[in-house]
UniProtKB/Swiss-Prot annotation:
Name of this chain's protein: Chemotaxis protein CheA
Ranges for domain CheW-like: 543-668
MF (Gene Ontology): ATP binding; phosphorelay sensor kinase activity
Disruption phenotype: Deletion leads to the loss of both chemotactic and phototactic responses.
Subunit structure: Interacts with CheW1, CheY, and several transducer proteins (HTR-I, HTR-II, BasT, CosT, MpcT, Htr4, Htr6, HtrVIII, Htr16 and Htr17).
Record domain HPt: where: 1-101
Compositionally biased residues, Low complexity: 133-146, 271-286
Region feature (Disordered): 123-149, 243-291
Species per Swiss-Prot/TrEMBL record: Halobacterium salinarum (strain ATCC 29341 / DSM 671 / R1)
Enzyme class: transferase
InterPro entries: Bact_Chemotaxis_CheA (IPR051315), CheA-like_dim (IPR004105), CheA-like_homodim_sf (IPR037006), CheA-like_P2_sf (IPR037052), CheA_P2-bd (IPR010808), CheA_signal_transducer (IPR053588), CheW-like_dom_sf (IPR036061), CheW-lke_dom (IPR002545)
Length: 668
């Protein structure tokens, strides 16, 4: 797929996400004019972009959606859930066309059925509302040459009276323009140069954005008596009607099929493409958005990954250089410190470039929750908080599916039917909240619902039934540990398998994915009140600071962020046959690194070093032979048969090409 097509698909996907979310706002508040304007503008842009790229079937589908939205905007059709279903069906068809273009470069799917389904709703409109003819919100679709023109629809009477030159009302018919924003802009520019433009309906900004039906209205003042001939020479318009305001005699109509010179059209198309994409995507004129667009630059993902790879190599080289210099020539250490500062700044910059706001993946979730709620006859209010919180692009991509699993779980298992909620003294409408917040170098993402919560007794019985735990084990198990069983593979409390969940897949995948990203996930539930799933994730990946420890002559790395204290080996006690140490009256299980990794220890009890891990990670103390220092390293996660090995998370390359294993203390 070439660069232009790739940019087209990317922009189209953004429009679809924007359209879905604005439609959800409109469905919940049919009187929301701002949402309706955004919806109509976006649908129009999609239609024009598809047409400009030659995807006529997709353009026709977007046109059908636009026509239906226009009838709603004019008040000819009421906004109902059933009609919104038809619009969403059209949006899904548009999204499928974009997917096909991305995969094959063309659209081969038959969208006729979807178009007919959308246009069938238009048949409900009296008159010719179902014919598919688009009219503007300003009634621009009706010709202005009927001898009864009211120019005060466009400008006030005082402005007309104050004009020094004769005033004319011009109805511009743009025909079936494929790029209304660009074409309207050219007509408006010509009118502004030729006449004194007193007003326009809709506004000039709206015309530049293509927010009109078949045409628009202009009121101008000019001493010229050749207004019709001047207007007929305007590029891009299909037809025009000129009427002298305050005079019963109409100026002659411009030639009814006047078209600008073809070569001029081609040039204008080429010149206007960038302007249209800039104005339509932002929802206001390109001039208004100039500063913002300059400050926000799209970076090609491949280039970003290449830059990130170079930084990794630079960091690795820095590590090798420092180790070599410390051993041979200390006079260059000052220069090395300067290199440290430079590479650290470069590293921070690249990491910041890789950060992407949560809204990039959250945008598709409101529609998901809405559709699932409709399928299950549930009333759900979906709330998003903190969608401007940023995460590394790789992490954000990886957690998209886990978040979807959690939301599906909240709809299916969490929120009750409206009648059940009412019987339990709750509002008929349930609430699911997706929130994100930054906590130093981590991001906390929560999915909360105010549903039924987890039934601990049911969970215990299911654990026994599936052979996960024995009856004796679950009887002594705290409720927190019982809740944690939801992450066990194949575990589900649903007796009935649904299309949404209940197959026992997904929750274990959520934990596996988050763990692989060096994060954690937990669940907290109160029966009758609701459930909260919390994912704790690092903001960035790859380059981390580690503590180097030695055991049996081998060197290992422990992420510094997991370390709470380093000390000499303390006295060891035995509790139920397990070795433990005591710190501040708290008992910590002892993990001897040599035993855990099956390498020979060079120390005995009472010797060596002790690394106590943060309680938030795991309440444990790790024994090793020696602590060698700390350093930032490039961590490469294990893949293939090495992935998933308890206690190991990846490897790092040090000076002289030495490879050090990075430990996963949570599973050690």
């Amino acid at each position: 797929m070439d660069d232009y097509l790739e940019a087209f698909v990317r922009e189209g996907e953004e429009h679809v996400t924007s359209l879905n979310n604005a439609l959800l706002e409109l469905e919940s508040d049919p009187g929301n004019e701002e949402a309706m304007d955004e919806i109509f503008r976006t649908a129009h842009t999609l239609k024009g972009n598809f047409g400009a790229m030659g995807f006529e079937d997709a353009s026709d589908l977007a046109h059908a959606v636009e026509d239906l939205l226009d009838e709603m905007r004019q008040g000819n059709l009421e906004v109902t859930s059933d009609r919104m279903d038809r619009i969403f069906e059209g949006i899904d068809g548009i999204e499928a066309c974009l997917d096909e273009i991305q995969a094959t470069g063309d659209v081969d799917r038959d969208v006729t059925g979807t178009i007919e389904s959308v246009r069938a709703v238009l048949d409900e409109v009296d008159g010719d509302g179902g014919s598919g003819t688009t009219t503007s919100s300003g009634d621009a679709g009706s010709p202005a040459g009927d001898g009864d023109v009211d120019a005060t629809r466009v400008v006030d009477a005082d402005t007309i009276d104050a004009a020094e030159d004769p005033v004319y009302h011009i109805h511009i018919d743009m025909g079936d323009s494929q790029m209304k924003g660009v074409d309207g802009m050219f007509v408006l520019e010509e009118a502004t140069e030729a006449f004194d433009l007193l007003g326009a309906e809709p506004s000039p900004d709206a015309i530049n954005d293509g927010e009109y039906g078949d045409g628009f209205e202009l009121v101008v003042a000019t001493p010229s008596d050749e207004v019709s001939d001047t207007v007929a020479a305007f590029p891009k318009l299909s037809d025009a009607t000129v009427t002298a305001v305050g005079d019963d005699e109409h100026a002659p109509d411009a030639d009814s099929g006047t078209e600008a010179d073809a070569s001029a059209d081609d040039d204008a198309d080429d010149a206007g493409t960038t302007a249209d994409s800039g104005s339509s995507s932002g929802g206001s004129s390109a001039i208004d958005n100039t500063d913002t667009e300059i400050q926000s630059v799209r970076v090609d993902v491949d280039q970003l990954d290449e830059l990130h790879g170079l930084v990794e190599q630079l960091v690795t080289t820095r590590i090798k250089l420092r180790r070599g210099m410390e051993e041979s020539d200390r006079e260059v250490l000052d220069e090395l410190d300067e290199l440290d500062k430079i590479t650290s700044s470069l590293q921070d910059t690249v990491m910041d470039m890789r950060l992407v706001p949560m809204k990039k993946i959250v945008g598709k979730f409101p529609r998901l929750v809405r559709d699932l709620a409709r399928e299950q006859d549930k009333d759900i209010d979906f709330v998003v908080e903190g969608d401007d919180v940023e995460l590394d692009r790789t992490i954000l991509t990886e957690i998209s599916d886990p978040l979807m699993h959690l939301l599906r779980n909240a709809v299916d298992h969490g929120i009750e039917k409206p009648a059940v909620r009412e019987d339990n003294g709750k509002d008929r409408e349930g609430t699911i909240t997706l929130s994100a917040e930054r906590d130093r170098d981590h991001v906390l993402i929560q999915v909360r619902d105010d549903g039924a919560g987890i039934d601990h007794d049911t969970m215990r019985e299911k654990a026994i039934e599936k052979g996960v735990k024995t009856r004796e084990e679950v009887q002594d198990m705290p409720d927190d540990d019982v809740e944690d069983l939801v992450f066990h593979p194949g575990f589900s409390t649903n007796d009935e398998v649904t299309d949404v969940s209940g197959r026992g897949v997904g929750m274990d995948v959520v934990r596996d994915t988050v763990t692989r990203l060096d994060g954690s996930v937990s669940v907290d539930s109160t029966p009758g009140e609701g459930t909260t799933f919390t994912m704790t994730l690092p903001v960035t990946v790859a380059i981390v600071k580690v503590l180097f420890v030695e055991s049996g002559g081998e060197e290992y790395g422990i992420p510094i962020k997991t370390v709470d204290e380093i000390s000499r080996m303390k006295s060891v006690k035995s509790v139920d046959g397990e070795e433990v140490i005591t710190y501040d009256e708290t008992v910590y299980p002892l993990v001897r690194l040599g035993d855990a990794l099956n390498v020979p220890d060079e120390t005995r009890n009472g010797d060596g070093m002790l690394v106590r891990i943060r309680d938030s990670e795991r309440q444990v103390a790790v024994h090793c032979d020696d602590v060698r220092g700390q350093e930032e390293v490039v961590v490469k996660p294990f893949e293939g048969i090495l992935s998933g090995i308890p206690g190991l998370s990846g490897a790092a390359v040090l000076g002289e090409g030495d490879v050090v294993t990075i430990l996963d203390v949570a599973t050690l």
